[in-house]
Amino acid sequence: MQENPTFNHQADLVNSAIRFINSWFRQSKTITAELSNFFILPGNKVIGAEVIVARLKGIFGQSDEYVGGRYDIIDVNFELMGEEKGMGFVEGVAGFRAVLKDQSKIISGPFKLYFALQNGSWKIVNIEFPGFAY
Protein backbone atom coordinates (compact mmCIF):
# COMPACT_ATOMS: atom_id res chain seq x y z
CA MET A 1 0.00 0.00 0.00
CA GLN A 2 1.40 3.38 -1.01
CA GLU A 3 1.51 6.18 1.57
CA ASN A 4 -0.32 9.38 0.62
CA PRO A 5 1.65 12.34 2.05
CA THR A 6 -1.16 14.80 1.20
CA PHE A 7 -3.57 12.95 3.45
CA ASN A 8 -1.06 12.84 6.31
CA HIS A 9 -0.38 16.58 6.20
CA GLN A 10 -4.08 17.37 5.96
CA ALA A 11 -4.83 15.07 8.90
CA ASP A 12 -1.98 16.62 10.92
CA LEU A 13 -3.36 20.12 10.29
CA VAL A 14 -6.90 19.12 11.25
CA ASN A 15 -5.75 17.28 14.38
CA SER A 16 -3.63 20.22 15.50
CA ALA A 17 -6.55 22.61 14.92
CA ILE A 18 -8.89 20.33 16.90
CA ARG A 19 -6.43 20.15 19.81
CA PHE A 20 -6.13 23.97 19.78
CA ILE A 21 -9.91 24.50 19.68
CA ASN A 22 -10.62 21.94 22.41
CA SER A 23 -7.90 23.49 24.59
CA TRP A 24 -9.49 26.90 23.95
CA PHE A 25 -12.90 25.66 25.10
CA ARG A 26 -11.33 24.19 28.28
CA GLN A 27 -9.16 27.32 28.78
CA SER A 28 -6.33 24.83 29.08
CA LYS A 29 -2.62 25.59 29.34
CA THR A 30 -2.01 22.75 26.87
CA ILE A 31 -3.07 25.16 24.13
CA THR A 32 0.56 26.30 23.97
CA ALA A 33 1.65 22.90 22.57
CA GLU A 34 0.12 23.84 19.21
CA LEU A 35 1.79 27.24 18.96
CA SER A 36 4.93 28.11 17.03
CA ASN A 37 7.80 29.92 18.76
CA PHE A 38 6.93 32.96 16.65
CA PHE A 39 3.82 34.47 15.07
CA ILE A 40 3.58 36.20 11.72
CA LEU A 41 1.10 39.09 11.71
CA PRO A 42 -0.11 41.25 8.84
CA GLY A 43 2.54 43.61 7.53
CA ASN A 44 5.21 40.90 8.07
CA LYS A 45 5.36 41.73 11.78
CA VAL A 46 6.87 38.87 13.79
CA ILE A 47 6.28 38.43 17.53
CA GLY A 48 7.29 35.76 20.01
CA ALA A 49 4.92 33.08 21.28
CA GLU A 50 5.25 34.44 24.84
CA VAL A 51 3.26 37.52 23.75
CA ILE A 52 0.48 35.28 22.41
CA VAL A 53 0.49 33.10 25.53
CA ALA A 54 0.14 36.20 27.73
CA ARG A 55 -2.74 37.40 25.54
CA LEU A 56 -4.47 34.00 25.80
CA LYS A 57 -4.12 34.02 29.59
CA GLY A 58 -5.68 37.50 29.66
CA ILE A 59 -8.59 36.39 27.49
CA PHE A 60 -9.19 33.23 29.53
CA GLY A 61 -9.05 35.27 32.75
CA GLN A 62 -12.06 37.35 31.64
CA SER A 63 -14.49 34.41 32.04
CA ASP A 64 -14.95 31.75 34.69
CA GLU A 65 -15.54 29.10 32.02
CA TYR A 66 -16.56 28.46 28.45
CA VAL A 67 -19.51 26.13 27.90
CA GLY A 68 -21.23 24.65 24.90
CA GLY A 69 -18.22 24.93 22.62
CA ARG A 70 -18.94 23.87 19.05
CA TYR A 71 -17.04 24.17 15.82
CA ASP A 72 -17.16 23.09 12.20
CA ILE A 73 -14.08 22.84 10.04
CA ILE A 74 -14.93 24.03 6.54
CA ASP A 75 -11.60 24.08 4.69
CA VAL A 76 -8.04 22.83 5.04
CA ASN A 77 -5.27 23.80 2.67
CA PHE A 78 -1.49 23.65 2.61
CA GLU A 79 1.50 24.09 0.35
CA LEU A 80 4.78 22.30 0.84
CA MET A 81 8.02 24.16 0.10
CA GLY A 82 10.40 21.24 0.19
CA GLU A 83 10.22 18.25 2.50
CA GLU A 84 10.56 20.10 5.80
CA LYS A 85 8.82 23.42 5.15
CA GLY A 86 5.30 24.47 4.31
CA MET A 87 2.43 26.82 5.03
CA GLY A 88 -1.21 25.94 5.59
CA PHE A 89 -4.46 26.87 7.22
CA VAL A 90 -7.60 25.41 8.76
CA GLU A 91 -10.77 27.49 8.72
CA GLY A 92 -14.33 27.17 9.85
CA VAL A 93 -16.77 28.52 12.41
CA ALA A 94 -16.76 28.24 16.19
CA GLY A 95 -18.95 29.35 19.07
CA PHE A 96 -19.15 29.07 22.82
CA ARG A 97 -20.77 30.69 25.84
CA ALA A 98 -18.45 32.70 28.10
CA VAL A 99 -19.72 32.58 31.69
CA LEU A 100 -18.75 35.06 34.42
CA LYS A 101 -20.64 34.61 37.69
CA ASP A 102 -24.32 35.14 36.81
CA GLN A 103 -23.72 36.58 33.36
CA SER A 104 -23.07 34.79 30.11
CA LYS A 105 -22.29 35.90 26.62
CA ILE A 106 -22.33 33.93 23.37
CA ILE A 107 -19.18 34.37 21.34
CA SER A 108 -19.18 32.98 17.82
CA GLY A 109 -17.87 33.58 14.33
CA PRO A 110 -15.47 32.37 11.70
CA PHE A 111 -11.98 31.17 12.56
CA LYS A 112 -8.81 30.66 10.60
CA LEU A 113 -5.69 29.12 12.05
CA TYR A 114 -2.50 29.61 10.02
CA PHE A 115 0.23 26.99 10.25
CA ALA A 116 3.88 26.59 9.31
CA LEU A 117 5.57 23.21 8.91
CA GLN A 118 8.66 23.29 11.12
CA ASN A 119 10.89 20.27 11.72
CA GLY A 120 8.18 17.90 10.49
CA SER A 121 5.45 19.37 12.73
CA TRP A 122 2.64 21.82 11.91
CA LYS A 123 2.57 24.74 14.37
CA ILE A 124 0.17 27.71 14.54
CA VAL A 125 1.76 30.99 13.42
CA ASN A 126 -1.35 33.22 13.33
CA ILE A 127 -4.78 33.04 14.97
CA GLU A 128 -8.11 34.44 13.88
CA PHE A 129 -10.62 33.07 16.39
CA PRO A 130 -13.86 34.36 17.99
CA GLY A 131 -12.95 36.19 21.20
CA PHE A 132 -9.27 36.56 20.28
CA ALA A 133 -7.62 39.84 19.31
CA TYR A 134 -3.97 40.84 19.11
Q: Which ranges hold each PLM region?
A:
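Short beta-strand edge/turn micro-motifs at domain boundaries
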Residues: 1-2, 105-134
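A broad structural signal for short, well-ordered beta-strand segments within beta-sheet-rich domains
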Residues: 9-13, 66-70, 124
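Short, hydrophobic secondary-structure boundary micro-motifs
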Residues: 32-34, 125-126
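Short, solvent-exposed loop/turn segments at secondary-structure boundaries
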Residues: 44, 102-104
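Extracytoplasmic/secreted envelope proteins and their assembly/folding machinery
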Residues: 17-18, 32, 53, 57
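A short gly/proline-enriched turn/hairpin at secondary-structure junctions
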Residues: 34-51, 65
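Surface-exposed, charged secondary-structure patches
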Residues: 54-102
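Short, low-complexity N-terminal intrinsically disordered segments enriched in polar/charged residues
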Residues: 1-30, 38
